[in-house]
Design a protein with these regions (language model features):
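Long, contiguous interaction/targeting segments characteristic
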Residues: 233, 265, 284-286, 293-296, ...
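Conserved hydrophobic beta-strand positions in leucine-rich repeat
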Residues: 72, 94-96, 113-117, 136-138, ...
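Cellulosome-associated attachment modules in secreted, modular CAZymes
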Residues: 418-480
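N-terminal capping/linker segments that flank leucine-rich repeat
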Residues: 2-93, 192-194, 257, 341-343, ...
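Canonical leucine-rich repeat
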Residues: 82-85, 104-106, 125, 146, ...
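Low-complexity, intrinsically disordered tandem-repeat tracts enriched in small residues
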Residues: 89, 102, 111, 123, ...
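Leucine-rich repeat
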Residues: 88-90, 109-112, 130-133, 140, ...
Length: 480
């Protein structure tokens, strides 16, 4: 009996003398070492990188060797798995961009501050435990969701070119830079990110964007959405505003006095007041519905693009700093660039769809009625007889063309001769024009009628023009 008790005590003593191995540690590892093998680091190329961290080349990473690793850069090495990254618990910076990763779990790398994992094939990314994370670049992947609720220290986030349908940054209150363009976002709440300075959310499906709380914002880039209303009145630090290709019908910029670059192409704008934006150097407003634009207070402007509008005159007499101008596809009849520094000009106006429609009364048109037109600067006329400021159109089925000296080069212009009373622009005056005027007025669209609908020449279009056309037709019919 004594022998059995002694044997049992001996066995217990042997067990107690053995080193303790936690359940979480691989059977191939001890608490103080990690073997550099296929089990711990299955990706051959990542394993090859890890071997370089083995300072004594014994095939094992000691605690000291692991603790020394705070920065890992394995970008562009065709790595498909970063399994084993969890052992590097002292890691603060990880660069693993331009690889073939499909998932990335960094839940054990709790000291991580900077992560660049862009241009992979990631469908999942776990950074929930990385509460120290300040910089996250995970763009150009295949992420459909991104949990950032615990990353309250995040300052820079670039998650563009993924497949995100939502993005919750309500807890990221110190976020300064957000690039989330080219996703599938239908809404974006940035109200809690009051430190935000740069917001790029273009090419999503946003219908609205509230930036009233983002008073530090100096750059907003939101093209290619479905935004109808954009209020930037609280964003007095805004220097760069790019809101093109939306559905914006009006925008107030009176409070944005430091604005230097404005791009609002392809919206539904009918007017644009930039009189207080005296710091403006770049203006791109093509593809809207402007009939005029006043740039007289914008003496620092260097670049203007206002193509595809309804602008009939453009006064650039005070824009001496202007070097680039593109104003094609407008009903302009002349252009004076003599006071500018324009060296690059795109001003061809020979497109019938956008050409100026000269309303011909009694077979003639007076060029002196055109704002800023100097007949001495016009040459190479076609389809007209010129007598001083009076032109007589030869063939109403053809456009009138001419060259014009802008002071910075010769530009080509076109006029479409339109008979007074031709309200529907079909090339003739008949009862259908009377009916068309009546329909447009009844629908409240009198302001959309062309100038040629003003048959009596009183400067406005109303039922009296329809009546005057009817009388004219009746008189001609009687005489014939």
């Amino acid at each position: 009996m004594k022998k059995k008790i002694f044997a049992g005590l001996s066995a217990l003593a042997l067990v107690l003398s053995m080193p303790f191995i936690p359940a979480s540690v691989s059977a191939e590892n001890t608490a103080s070492e990690v073997k550099i093998n296929e089990t711990n680091f299955p990706d051959e190329k990542f394993r090859g990188f890890v071997k370089k961290l083995d300072q004594n080349s014994n095939g094992i990473l000691s605690d000291t060797e692991i603790a020394a690793v705070t920065n890992i850069n394995v970008s562009g090495k065709e790595i498909s798995s970063l399994k084993g990254i969890e052992y590097f618990t002292s890691l603060t910076v990880l660069n693993c961009y331009k690889n073939q990763l499909t998932s990335l779990d960094l839940s054990q790398n709790k000291l991580l501050e900077e992560l660049e994992c862009y241009s992979n094939q990631l469908t999942s990314l776990n950074v929930r435990n990385d509460t120290n994370l300040k910089i996250l670049y995970c763009y150009n992947n295949q992420l459909t969701s991104l949990n950032l609720r615990n990353n309250t220290n995040l300052e820079q986030l670039s998650c563009y070119k993924n497949q995100l349908t939502s993005l919750n940054i309500g807890k990221n209150t110190v976020l300064e830079t957000l690039y989330c363009y080219s996703n599938q976002l239908t809404s974006l709440d940035v109200s809690q990110s009051t430190a935000l300075k740069e917001l790029v959310c273009s090419t999503n499906q946003l219908t609205s964007l509230d930036i009233s709380k983002n008073t530090a914002l100096f750059k907003l880039n939101c093209p290619g959405n479905k935004i109808e209303l954009l209020d930037v009145s609280n964003n007095k630090n805004l220097q760069y505003l790019y809101c093109d290709s939306n559905q914006i019908s009006s925008i107030e910029l009176g409070e944005n006095t430091v604005l230097s670059s404005l791009v609002c192409n392809n919206n539904n704008l009918t007017s644009l007041d930039i009189s207080r934006n005296t710091a403006l150097t770049r203006l791109r407003c093509s593809g809207n519905r402007f009939k005029s634009i006043d740039v007289s207070n914008n003496e620092k402007l260097q670049n203007i693009e206002c193509d595809y509008n309804h602008i009939t005159s453009l006064d650039l007499s005070r824009n001496t700093a202007l070097t680039n101008l593109s104003c094609t596809r407008n009903p302009l009849t002349s252009l004076d660039l003599s006071q500018t520094s324009v060296s690059k000009l795109n001003a061809d106006q020979t497109n019938k769809e956008y050409a100026y429609r000269a309303v011909i009364r009694e077979g003639k048109f007076d060029l002196s009625t055109l704002s800023g037109f100097d007949v001495s600067k016009a040459s190479d006329w076609t389809n007209v007889q010129l007598d001083g400021n009076i032109i007589t159109v030869t063939d109403f089925s053809e456009p009138v063309t001419y060259k014009y000296d802008t002071g910075k080069g010769i530009a080509s212009f076109m006029m479409i001769a339109t008979l007074a009373g031709d309200a529907n622009l079909d090339g003739k005056v008949d009862v259908r024009d009377c009916a068309y005027i009546a329909r447009m007025l009844a629908a409240g669209k009198g302001n959309e009628l062309p100038d040629s609908a003003d048959f009596n020449g009183d400067g406005k279009t109303d039922v009296r023009d329809a009546a005057a056309i009817a009388r004219f037709l009746a008189k001609n019919h009687k005489n014939n």
